[in-house]
């Protein structure tokens, strides 16, 4: 019944305005952040066209992407939320491009997740795939870092720069 559906849509819009997922404080940059991930995701989403596909990775890309990405008509937002299989995102973006390469595919990933399939960057180059990669470089495995800090405190182990026992390639050097 159209009237009931319209009522429900209005009700959901009221709740969305009354209880926003992203608050103004989320857009405030922290002292230790070179960029604000919420602001970056929102800005990326503003520039993505209708009917375009965006793939997000794990951790910050998935959580913040799910909160701050503003969808437009016909867009697809592909994530593996709650599955947490790191490295899913780059092959998923390649698969999305193979399925529909009429428009560029947008990929938002983290420096930890992209390392699981870093070699696939060559696949993108070799096949001239239209995949635009936005990388959240937070110095390692951020979700693991947060879990360790919240539940176990110090010492941090196996997370990247902060733990001093794991290194990552220079993402700046890999960018083209």
What are these regions (language model features)?
Residues 7-8, 15, 97, 176:
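A residue-identity detector for tryptophan
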Residues 13-96:
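Active-site diphosphate/adenylate-binding microenvironment
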Residues 1-10:
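Terminal amphipathic helices with adjacent charged low-complexity linkers/tails
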Residues 1-2, 64, 69-176:
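Thiamine diphosphate
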């Amino acid at each position: 019944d159209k009237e009931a559906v319209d009522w429900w849509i209005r009700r959901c819009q009221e709740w969305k305005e009354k209880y926003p997922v992203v608050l103004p404080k989320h857009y405030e940059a922290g002292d230790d952040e070179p960029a604000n991930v919420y602001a970056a995701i929102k800005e990326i989403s503003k520039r993505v066209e209708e009917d375009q596909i965006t793939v997000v990775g794990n951790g910050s890309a998935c959580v913040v992407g799910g909160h701050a990405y503003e969808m437009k008509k016909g867009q697809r937002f592909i994530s593996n939320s709650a599955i947490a299989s790191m490295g899913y995102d780059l092959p998923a973006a390649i698969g999305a491009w193979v399925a529909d390469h009429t428009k560029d595919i947008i990929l938002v990933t983290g420096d930890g997740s992209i390392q699981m399939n870093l070699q696939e960057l060559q696949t993108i180059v070799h096949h001239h795939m239209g995949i635009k990669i936005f990388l959240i470089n937070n110095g390692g495995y951020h979700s693991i870092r947060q879990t360790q800090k919240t539940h176990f405190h110090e010492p941090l182990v196996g997370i990247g720069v902060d733990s001093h026992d794991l290194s990552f390639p220079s993402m700046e050097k890999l960018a083209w």
